[in-house]
Amino acid sequence: MTNKKKVNLYKDLYAENSNYFRNLIPMYRLINSCINFEIKSFLDYGCGKSNLADIFYNMRKIKTYKYDPAINDYSYLDKHIKVDLIANCDVMEHVPEDEVDNIFEEMSNISKNIFFNIYLTRAETILPNGENAHCTIKPIQWWQSKILKHFKYANIVLTSYKNSVCIITWKISYYHRILNFYAFIINSFEHMIWKVFHYKLWK
């Protein structure tokens, strides 16, 4: 994202919420269920304060990278970097519409295999300037059309994340769709248990 004002808003947001952390084990489970090719390197593009790259390293022992322009430690992206897989989770809806194609183009130069998780509704998070964090809200078909301008495939897979869609840029077999379904069921069950536990805890 090249919009410096927008990037600075997210820097301010992270500063205001310094203890924020996002556990993406369920996301890893979804991504892993769809992988039908060898991966030796992974990039979390728009990583925020999540542990997705760390999970990939711990589970697969591969080279991992993090990139997020709003986090100083991860704000540099090597122009020559190439990886086997990119995860782009809860990112594109934060990108201004006039920058979407540029982001897709940049990622397509890094890898042909991208796992997108894109939210389709407004966010609960409000930026320091009063704007909703999700500035580009579009239907699934719009995102697929955009992705297909830069990648060969834009296949929808199951997601357990409410109000979002998962799209992958590689061909997936029926076998891996079954694995994806199992991951979806496990994530949904875990989420149900979590909701019941917290309801009883605070009742």
Go through each PLM region and give its residues.
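Conserved N-terminal segment of class I S-adenosyl-L-methionine
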Residues: 1-83, 98-104, 130-142, 151, ...
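Hydrophobic adenine-recognition pocket in adenosine-nucleotide-binding enzymes
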Residues: 91-94
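Conserved beta-strand signature within the Rossmann-like core of class I S-adenosyl-L-methionine
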Residues: 111-121
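A short acidic, helix-capping loop that chelates divalent metal ions and anchors anionic groups
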Residues: 123-130
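Surface-exposed, flexible loop/turn segments at secondary-structure boundaries
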Residues: 72, 122-123
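Class I S-adenosylmethionine-dependent transferase superfamily signal
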Residues: 107
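A conserved beta-strand element that flanks and buttresses the S-adenosyl-L-methionine
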Residues: 87
